[in-house]
């Protein structure tokens, strides 16, 4: 079984809302047009933080953010591969970005996150936010 290691940015703006991005059409129906936190694969010889900066620059043209802390690592078994995802809480006061790889986005409060149709691997991150970050 193929194993993939990725990073995800749980990006919070100055209003305390989180950036949720929607994947485009995909041949893998279980991630087709699902919502996720932006991020992507860690390249060889790249740290998790370096991967996060590179991926947000590639996917969103976003460079103005700070990595605050690591939130959670999720291991999820999809039908075709095993995904290990390292999620980091990131902040940006005035995040300006462009959707280069996604088809839609929302800024949502923690309690609104469950309204979206999330990729299965992102659900534990959403639950973690609801259980921990909403108290801060």
Regions picked out by a protein language model, each given a short descriptive name:
Residues 1, 10, 26-28, 75, ...:
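Short secondary-structure boundary/capping segments
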Residues 1-19, 41:
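Conserved N-terminal beta-strand and adjoining loop/helix that marks the start
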Residues 4, 13, 63-66, 72-96, ...:
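Active-site-adjacent beta-strand/loop module that shapes the phosphate/pyrophosphate-binding cleft
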Residues 17-58:
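Conserved Nudix-box catalytic region and its N-terminal flanking loop in Nudix hydrolases
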Residues 42-43, 76, 112-114:
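Short histidine/acidic/glycine/proline-rich micro-motifs that form metal-
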Residues 87-89, 98-129:
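NUDIX/MutT-family hydrolases
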Residues 130-136:
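Generic C-terminal helix-cap and adjacent flexible tail
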């Amino acid at each position: 079984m193929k194993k993939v290691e990725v990073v995800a940015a749980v990006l919070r703006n100055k209003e305390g809302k989180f950036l949720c991005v929607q994947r485009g059409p995909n041949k893998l129906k279980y991630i087709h047009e699902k919502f996720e936190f932006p991020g992507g694969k860690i390249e060889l010889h790249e740290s998790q933080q370096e991967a996060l900066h590179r991926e947000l620059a590639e996917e969103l043209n976003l460079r103005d953010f700070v990595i605050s802390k690591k939130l959670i690592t999720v291991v999820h078994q999809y039908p075709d591969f095993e995904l290990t995802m390292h999620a980091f809480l990131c902040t940006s006061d005035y995040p300006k970005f462009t959707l280069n790889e996604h088809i839609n986005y929302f800024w949502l409060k923690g309690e609104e996150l469950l309204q979206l149709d999330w990729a299965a691997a992102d659900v534990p991150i959403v639950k973690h936010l609801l259980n921990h970050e909403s108290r801060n």
